């Protein structure tokens, strides 16, 4: 009996140690962007049009609802393809869906040729009304890569990708044009140049005041 208890204790401790080790390798980051649109306009694209993310994402070439899902909502599922052969993909599920707060958590339950561990990969989407026809779109992500040592390197790439996603969302809302891998380079220049010009104007005003 004592031997059995010892074995069970060791198994439990071992499981806890593995879980703790896995959690330590989880990477997190949070990015946000103020957009010149109402919160309702932004939410319509990132929340209500969940299955059509390919229309407003620079890397996803095709997306759709799966497993009987017909629209956004609690438990809605989608697939996102990142290459023409559809071998690189993410299957995702929407949970904690709150249209009142304009927020949801996006979980990954299957990854095809994509270096993330679905069990430890998820992101919280949140749209906040800032008034005057503007809103803030924030993206709070945690993930673990496979292999785990790639996490630190992948973190920077993921942050850049989400910042590009913000630009794609902005362009899609403004023009109605679908964003693709092919046209995003041109699209990005339009918005990055405008932001740089705006920053320069602020600096010029500041220097003039001095």
Q: Each predicted region: which residue ranges?
A:
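Beta-strand/loop substructures that line and gate deep hydrophobic ligand-binding cavities in soluble
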Residues: 110-164
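Hydrophobic pocket/interface hotspot
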Residues: 41-46, 53, 78, 94, ...
């Amino acid at each position: 009996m004592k031997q059995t208890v010892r074995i069970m204790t060791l198994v439990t401790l071992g499981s806890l140690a593995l879980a703790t080790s896995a959690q330590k390798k989880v990477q997190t980051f949070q990015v946000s962007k103020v957009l010149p649109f109402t919160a309702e306009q932004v939410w319509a694209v990132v929340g209500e049009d969940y299955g059509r993310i390919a229309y407003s994402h620079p890397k996803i070439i095709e997306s759709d609802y799966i497993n009987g899902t017909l629209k956004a909502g609690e438990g809605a599922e989608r697939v996102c393809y990142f290459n023409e052969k559809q071998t690189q993909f993410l299957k995702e599920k929407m949970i904690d869906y709150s249209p009142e707060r304009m927020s949801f958590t996006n979980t990954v339950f299957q990854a095809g040729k994509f270096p993330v561990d679905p069990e430890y990969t998820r992101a919280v989407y949140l749209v906040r009304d800032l008034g005057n026809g503007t809103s803030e779109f924030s993206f709070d992500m945690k993930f673990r890569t496979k292999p785990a040592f790639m996490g630190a390197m992948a973190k920077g790439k993921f942050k850049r990708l989400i910042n590009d996603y913000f630009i794609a969302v902005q362009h899609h809302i403004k023009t109605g044009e679908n964003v693709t891998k092919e046209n995003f380079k041109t699209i990005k220049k339009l918005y990055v140049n405008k932001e740089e010009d705006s920053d320069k104007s602020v600096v010029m005003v500041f220097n003039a005041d001095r």
